[in-house]
Amino acid sequence: MSKGKRVFVTGSTGCIGTHAVELIMNEGAEVFGFNRSAPLDLSGKSLYHYIKGDLADQQSLKAALEEARPTHILHLGALQTPDCRDYPMRGMEVNLMGTALLFKACSDMQLPLERFVFASSSAVNGPRSLYGPEGVRPEDPYQPFNLYGYWKIAGEGMAQAFQQATQVPTVSLRLATTYGPGRDRGFTAAMTSAIKAVVKSESYEIPYRGRENYHFSIDVGAGFARATLDPFSGYGVYNLLGETRSVDEFIALLGEEADQFGLSTDLIAYAEDAEETPFIYDLNDDATRSAFPSMPNTSLQAGIRASIQFFQAEN
């Protein structure tokens, strides 16, 4: 159990944050959620404390940290790739400057920190052809496709510098495509949208083709919770556990599972302009399994099945 631990979570109301916070509180830790908007439902969540604020606002950030006096920090707050593309200055303000302000505040305030976890991304990597048969390893070269990836590289650099300066155990955890309950925004939310469409017997056009490294959303929350609470020392970069499949394979598995529920994928198709998209896939997670052996990894088929059940109950 983690009673007595005080976990400061940025982006605690997002898809990943919601799942991570639930698991952290289940272990008895208090959570201080730092967000621009409050959670929709706080009933029965006596261990959750909402603090309103903006990552790019240095004063509100410092005030929030002073109020929380956290022992652990889970930094999930960020704009996603489409928002960074469409609003690059705001993306830089939140993803780059907000991250820098958080690390600086933690250093300046001499908080009683036992752990800092930074949510990075496989967007720091490049085309699959750059990497060997063992997959994309955390130590492999950076080669991002966009500003979002470059800002995540900067975040990883700040995380390592922070650990070297403070000796606070620090983890940068990378992930690729999240699917399942709670995933409703971002370009790669397409596969979750396809599952929802199947449940509702609606048509849906998938906007891209290619291969993706899939992570079940509840596993993602659990992965960040484990990186935050489980024993760890020093600094490390890790790939979140997941499974690589093509979009075609995802649709085929969705069809198999849909059939078990009397549903069909007949209305799911590719958009006419769907092109091969250079996603990062084949993430090597050997080091992750060694460092955090209790991280879960639900198979893609089981995750799709659980997602159908979740969206049916919600529908």
Predicted regions and their residues:
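Flexible, glycine-rich beta-alpha linker
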Residues: 125, 146-147, 171-189
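Glycine/proline-rich active-site loop of Rossmann-fold NAD(P)-dependent oxidoreductases
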Residues: 153, 166, 179-192, 217-218, ...
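C-terminal substrate-binding subdomain of Rossmann-fold SDR/epimerase-dehydratase oxidoreductases
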Residues: 202, 206-210, 214-315
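Conserved Rossmann-fold NAD(P)-dependent oxidoreductase catalytic core, especially the SDR/UDP-sugar
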Residues: 100-147
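Conserved beta-loop-beta element that borders a ligand/cofactor-binding pocket
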Residues: 115, 120-121, 156-181
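NAD(P)H-binding glycine-rich loop region in Rossmannoid oxidoreductase-like domains
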Residues: 55-94
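N-terminal Rossmann NAD(P)H-binding glycine-rich loop of SDR-like oxidoreductase domains
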Residues: 7-27
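A conserved pocket-lining segment of Rossmann-fold NAD(P)-dependent short-chain dehydrogenase/reductase
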Residues: 84-85, 141, 170-181, 193-215, ...
